Amino acid sequence: MIKLNTNENPYPPAPGVQEAIKSLDDKKMRLYPDPTADLLVSELADFYHLDKDQIFVGVGSDDVLAMCFLTFFNSERPIFFPDITYSFYDVWADVFRIPYECQPLDENFRIVKEDYYRANGGVIFPNPNAPTGIADRKSVV
């Protein structure tokens, strides 16, 4: 078994990757990137014809996910997500003291959408669901 979760990889990088790393400016590599990502936000705004304040950029997927939890899940009701899914949903729920309920997948590891048809504080419907690799059609979502 090869573990590929959490950006781990048992294989060395491709030769081109090592060459690219060597060509980087080591002075810039010692600093954190711009936390506002202003250049990226400006380029995205221009490309998509949006105002800069309509674009949110995080410093990684876990950061973006944390901001989503803080923004969208602010009810006393529990949020719902599958019992077999990305391992950080319950972590953020615990950190931010958001009640949650894990909904069991069916015998084919699919989300049972009817389990989510009741009062809740929000739903996380991962699609595709990373651990299972199953992607549902838009009509299911």
Predicted regions and their residues:
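N-terminal "arm"/small-domain region of PLP-dependent enzymes with the aminotransferase-like
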Residues: 1-31, 117-127
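Conserved core of the PLP fold type I
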Residues: 29-141
